[in-house]
């Protein structure tokens, strides 16, 4: 069925290599005989979620099935596997440990059933094993070191032994075991500085973390030496040099390096959204950090180790409307494109708004981290991943720095291109004020997709778009008056506004010149996915 045409899409009569003034036209040029190599899938290696217990919910599982199918995510990382709401550890009256893996089994079995694997964050501390009362978040995650490192070692050994027995050695060798989460932030590790300044306390916290790391990796590898253990899982790419030096000096394995990065001007932790965040106007934000860490690893004893950014996003608080806005899709694609092979994975934080660090949220759109909101509504950020997952297995060389052009085994071609514009006015304006409003995207002129050395014949051309008021569910919600609770009719309206249906679906012909050329109007932060499917 012919869809309404929402774009300027005129077949161009001139040959696909005809010159155009650079200032007048953006040209995305690809020759199907010029291959760059296999399409990188580092973008969907892993995705984040809030905490393990949320993974027992039907709506969480429904949403993960959806993003697994449409975006191709293979691993998932979450906090709280060892929190008391997972019931993993108690002690009897004599202080003997009691282990219980029933909730863990339920969650991991579900992941196995949909073809995903856990990227296992080993934390937080079970209450009965904790050395202190300090907690974080609404769900009271204990952030203190173990009261007895030998009991911690035995606990980790028992846990790893259990999953090995349940899923098999060969399977667990494909998992990752990450020691703790953001130990360079007092809120996540130790819980108190004891009156010391941050500078005075940092080496104390780091020393205690390395004790935890050493104990944990020995426990994991006592089950199987080939199991992968890494860290330091820090905020802001912190403690990288220190961790590389410590593990090298002690002869400890560091099978992978993990850390986090967010594109904000300052800060690392704000679960309640009270501080106010500011999106960085540095186009190299996140990208520069990743490349710097990879470079330092390459000069270390761990040059062969993988680099996993196990959290990243535009902002580190689940109360930032930039997460809901149309700006997010182009932001994500810009980072994925420019980071490239510097990271083994970039695990977006998170796939869902079902996220309870500050407790259940009271509105359908509140600046949550998720690609999907509570009602399964697809945000613009979701489409960045869905579009990436539509790319074929072979990437073509392309002259445009904000594009991927790929082909698949069936003879199809996919072109994904975007504009990444940072509209944030001045640092004095916080995200919570700027991105909650309706901001019209300015026109950027046409982009022309030119393909050469195509097979002659008829193709079905599908064009998909995300941008301002195009699969822009936040704008549609604003149009409804920003209701705090949604009726079924309103959900249906919003679902229709973010359906992801093609805005153009037609047949096109590639003639004897083997060229295809088409123009598409671009606005700020528009994203286009063009698919050409051969018709037999």
Per-segment meaning from a language model:
Residues 50-62, 84, 95-102, 185-187, ...:
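Acidic-and-aromatic substrate-binding clefts and catalytic sites of carbohydrate-active enzymes
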Residues 63, 258-259, 264-320, 335, ...:
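Glycoside hydrolase catalytic-domain groove-lining segments
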Residues 84-88, 127-136, 184-190, 264-271, ...:
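Short acidic/His/Gly/Ser-rich catalytic and metal-binding motifs that mark active-site loops
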Residues 233-259, 307, 312-331, 335-340, ...:
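Substrate-binding cleft/loops of secretory-pathway carbohydrate-active enzymes
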Residues 279, 283, 321-329, 371-375:
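Hydrophobic alpha-helical scaffolding
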């Amino acid at each position: 069925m012919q869809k309404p045409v929402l774009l300027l899409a005129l077949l161009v009569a001139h040959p696909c290599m005809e010159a155009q003034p650079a200032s007048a036209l953006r040209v995305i040029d690809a020759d199907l005989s010029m291959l760059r190599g296999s399409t990188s899938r580092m973008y969907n290696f892993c995705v984040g979620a809030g905490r393990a217990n949320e993974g027992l919910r039907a709506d969480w599982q429904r949403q993960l099935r959806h993003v697994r199918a449409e975006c191709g995510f293979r691993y998932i990382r979450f906090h709280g596997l060892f929190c008391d709401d997972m019931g993993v550890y108690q002690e009897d009256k004599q202080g003997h440990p009691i282990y219980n893996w029933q909730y863990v089994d339920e969650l991991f079995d579900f992941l196995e059933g949909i073809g995903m694997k856990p990227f296992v964050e080993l934390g937080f501390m079970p209450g009965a094993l904790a050395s202190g009362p300090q907690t974080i978040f609404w769900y009271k995650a204990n952030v203190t070191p173990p009261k007895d490192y030998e009991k911690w070692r035995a606990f980790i050994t028992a846990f790893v032994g259990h999953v090995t027995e349940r899923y098999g050695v060969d399977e667990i060798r494909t998992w990752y075991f990450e020691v703790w989460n953001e130990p360079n932030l007092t809120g996540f590790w130790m819980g108190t500085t004891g009156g010391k300044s941050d500078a005075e306390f940092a080496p104390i916290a780091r020393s205690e973390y390395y004790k935890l790391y050493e104990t944990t990796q020995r426990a994991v590898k006592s089950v199987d030496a080939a199991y992968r253990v890494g860290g330091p899982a820090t905020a802001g790419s912190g403690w990288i040099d220190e961790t590389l030096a410590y593990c090298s000096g002690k002869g400890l394995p560091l099978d992978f390096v993990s850390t986090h990065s967010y594109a904000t001007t300052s800060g690392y932790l704000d679960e309640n959204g009270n501080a106010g965040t500011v999106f960085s106007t540095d186009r190299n934000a996140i990208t520069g950090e990743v490349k710097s860490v990879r470079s330092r690893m390459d000069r270390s004893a761990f040059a062969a180790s993988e680099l996993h950014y196990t959290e990243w996003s535009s902002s580190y608080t689940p109360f930032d409307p930039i997460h809901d806005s149309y700006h997010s899709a182009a932001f994500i694609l810009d980072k994925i494109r420019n980071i490239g092979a510097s990271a083994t994975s970039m695990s977006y934080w998170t796939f869902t708004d079902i996220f309870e660090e500050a407790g259940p949220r009271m509105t359908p759109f509140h600046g949550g981290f998720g690609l999907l909101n509570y009602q399964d509504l697809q945000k613009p950020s979701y489409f960045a991943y869905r579009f990436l997952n539509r790319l074929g297995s072979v990437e073509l060389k392309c002259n445009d720095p904000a594009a991927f052009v790929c082909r698949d085994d069936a003879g199809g071609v996919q072109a994904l291109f975007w504009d990444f514009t940072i509209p944030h006015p001045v640092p004095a304006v916080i995200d919570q004020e700027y991105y909650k409003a309706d901001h019209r995207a300015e026109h950027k002129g046409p982009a022309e997709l030119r393909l050469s050395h195509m097979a002659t014949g008829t193709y079905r051309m599908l064009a998909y778009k995300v941008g301002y008021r195009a699969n822009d569910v936040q704008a549609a919600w604003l149009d409804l008056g920003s209701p705090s609770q949604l009726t079924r009719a309103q959900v249906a309206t919003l679902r229709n506004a973010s359906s992801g249906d093609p805005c153009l679906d037609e047949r096109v012909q590639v003639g004897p010149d083997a060229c295809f050329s088409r123009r598409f109007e671009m606005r700020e932060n528009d994203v286009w996915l063009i698919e050409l499917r051969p018709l037999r």
